[in-house]
């Protein structure tokens, strides 16, 4: 399904510098994540969503990245409390370890937990977000069973401009950010810094024995930067960096105020060179770090857990008489340190090939990849997709693909509870979709079946083993367009996420969930409402601890004072709905946020 949130121009180099396109206001939405090569989002065979900067700003600083993702088709979110607390993202019913997170093409996340710190990535530093639902290991390797979410940081172009934002709201929430961006034909640059803080509320409630009634503060300081230098036509050198440092309080009883300090960072440098009219080479290398320090009653001086990922990629894009060829080599070195517990590492060497083509009414995509992991050996994955334009307004498309997840370092080596003999989890997915677009309206329907085997689960002695299986089957329906002067987007998901061995529903997955957004621009004023609904869930495996369904209504407004200044406001959870996404953990009640933005056009 394609939800095109904007037709504004996108600078493709932001995700994969090899794929730069000239900016222009008449360009359609572009994605690179679906194929690792630039293409129109509405022509992607993979189930793809692109969230542009306008939509991110509309979400407002009172929204987090996980909350924004949860408003997209096929995605569910659960959180252990309010802002900055541990958050899980599920795509099409897969678990949180089955989503690969990229920042400007670089992997970012914890190799000990197997998940990303979604809650710590600030929206103020993001230019756009690309979401690919379905298996993507044939493009990106391990962990892309449910899909890939890629964050693209802010870039610069045109005359140098300063931009800034300041805002405040409920729960003692406040945010400030500022940046500068600009560029010429030879050089482009951007830099932005920000800080946010909230007094928040108690992460837990009385259902849990570790409940503490105090507010669990969260704060986040962040920075991003980007540059690109073009010394000659067809040649470009550049890089980007994202850094976010946070502190989050959490409940662990009344006798101690526990908190953790975390830092997420990702940087990369690249060289893109068009050697001939048909051949472009891109070399990129960089590093990401997930650094976590916990201060608790059992560790008053702090306990550090750190993941470092060094990454190298050499990609070749070759234009063929029919279609385009992709060939690449990657090297990934992962090192994880759990203070006083283990200090381990592994390396992965990967080779991949891909071919995409449009032949008349036919669209094709083929990908194959082999990953050789020093810990568990080799894995080969593949993807085949086909689309056919039945009518100028109607397309049918389908795909099959395999994927896998690598065991985490905790699962492998945690003292007394690790299993170094673990193998990778495997997945095989089939899907088919219909897409209709006419007169500014688009409708889509996607059906998928994903079978995951060799799942890692704990035995009766809490030792992880490859013993479980899952069946995920669902339908995603979507609409985007304009009705009676209102911009409208909507999605509805039906999901059957089962443990294949017990027949029970998987934990924290709803069978039905939906999103609706309606907005209207009246001269300088933009008004909108949003609604997100979810069916019931179970907090634990084997359908233990039921969680009720819920619906949350939000409203927002923006008024442009002139070409440079605007005032913004949001009212979240208007009806003050009390609900939980995880048993015993609170969610925000009714709250407001107002801000002033300076952004010269």
Features from the language model and the residues they span:
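Short acidic/polar hinge/loop motifs at secondary-structure boundaries
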Residues: 106-133
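Periplasmic-side early beta-strands and strand-to-turn transitions of outer-membrane beta-barrels
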Residues: 137-138, 150, 157-159, 165-167, ...
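Outer-membrane beta-barrel domain signature, strongest for Gram-negative TonB-dependent receptors
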Residues: 212-334, 443
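Outer-membrane beta-barrel signature, preferentially recognizing the C-terminal barrel domain
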Residues: 255-274, 305-310, 374-377, 389, ...
């Amino acid at each position: 399904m394609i939800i095109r949130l904007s037709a504004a121009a996108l600078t493709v180099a932001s995700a994969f510098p090899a794929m730069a396109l000239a900016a222009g206001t008449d360009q359609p939405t572009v994605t690179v994540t679906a194929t690792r090569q630039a293409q129109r989002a509405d022509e992607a065979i993979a189930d793809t969503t692109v969230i542009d900067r306008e939509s991110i700003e509309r979400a407002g600083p009172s929204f987090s990245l996980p909350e924004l993702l949860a408003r997209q088709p096929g995605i569910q979110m659960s959180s252990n409390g309010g802002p900055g607390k541990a958050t899980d993202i599920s795509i099409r019913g897969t678990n949180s370890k089955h989503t690969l997170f990229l920042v400007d093409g670089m992997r970012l996340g914890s190799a000990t937990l197997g998940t990303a710190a979604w809650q710590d990535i600030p929206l103020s530093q993001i230019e756009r977000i690309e979401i690919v639902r379905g298996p993507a290991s044939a493009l990106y390797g391990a962990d892309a069973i449910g899909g890939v979410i890629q964050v693209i940081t802010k870039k610069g172009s045109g005359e140098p401009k300063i931009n800034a934002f300041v805002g405040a709201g409920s729960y003692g929430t406040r945010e400030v950010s500022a940046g500068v961006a600009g560029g010429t034909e030879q050089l482009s640059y951007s830099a932005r810094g920000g800080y946010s803080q909230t007094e928040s509320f108690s992460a837990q409630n009385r259902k849990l024995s570790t409940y503490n009634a105090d507010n669990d503060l969260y704060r986040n300081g962040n920075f991003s930067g980007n540059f690109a230098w073009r010394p000659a036509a067809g040649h470009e050198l550049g890089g980007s960096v994202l850094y976010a440092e946070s502190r989050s309080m959490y409940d662990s009883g009344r006798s101690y105020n526990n908190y953790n300090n975390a830092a997420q960072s990702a940087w990369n440098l690249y060289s893109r060179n068009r050697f001939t009219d048909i051949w472009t080479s891109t070399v990129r290398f960089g590093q990401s770090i997930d650094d976590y320090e916990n201060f608790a009653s059992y560790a008053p001086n702090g306990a550090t857990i750190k993941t470092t990922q060094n990454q190298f990629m050499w990609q070749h894009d070759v234009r063929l008489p029919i279609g385009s060829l992709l060939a690449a080599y990657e090297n990934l070195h992962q090192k994880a340190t759990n203070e006083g517990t283990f200090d381990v590492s592994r390396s992965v060497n990967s080779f991949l090939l891909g071919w995409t083509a449009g032949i008349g009414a036919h669209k094709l995509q083929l990908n194959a990849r082999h990953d050789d992991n020093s810990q568990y050996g080799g894995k080969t994955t593949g993807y085949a997709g086909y689309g056919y334009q039945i009518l100028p307004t109607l397309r049918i498309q389908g795909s099959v693909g395999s994927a896998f997840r690598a065991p985490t370092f905790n699962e492998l080596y945690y003292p007394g509870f690790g299993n170094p003999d673990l193998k990778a989890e495997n997945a095989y997915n089939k899907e088919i979709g219909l897409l209709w677009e006419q007169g500014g309206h688009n409708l889509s329907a996607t059906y998928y079946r994903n079978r995951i085997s060799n799942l890692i689960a704990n035995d009766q002695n809490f030792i992880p083993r490859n013993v479980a299986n899952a069946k995920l089957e669902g339908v995603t329906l979507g609409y985007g367009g304009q009705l009676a002067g209102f911009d409208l987007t909507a999605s509805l998901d039906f999901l059957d996420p089962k443990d294949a061995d017990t027949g029970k529903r998987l934990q924290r997955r709803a069978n039905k969930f939906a999103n609706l957004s309606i907005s209207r621009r009246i001269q300088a004023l933009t008004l909108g409402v949003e609604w997100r609904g979810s069916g019931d869930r179970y907090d634990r495996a084997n359908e233990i601890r039921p969680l009720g369904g819920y619906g949350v209504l939000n409203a927002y407004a923006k008024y442009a004072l002139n070409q440079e200044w605007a005032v913004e406001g949001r009212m979240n959870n208007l009806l003050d709905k009390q609900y939980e996404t995880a048993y015993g953990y609170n969610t925000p009640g009714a709250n407001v946020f107002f801000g002033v933005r300076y952004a010269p056009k």
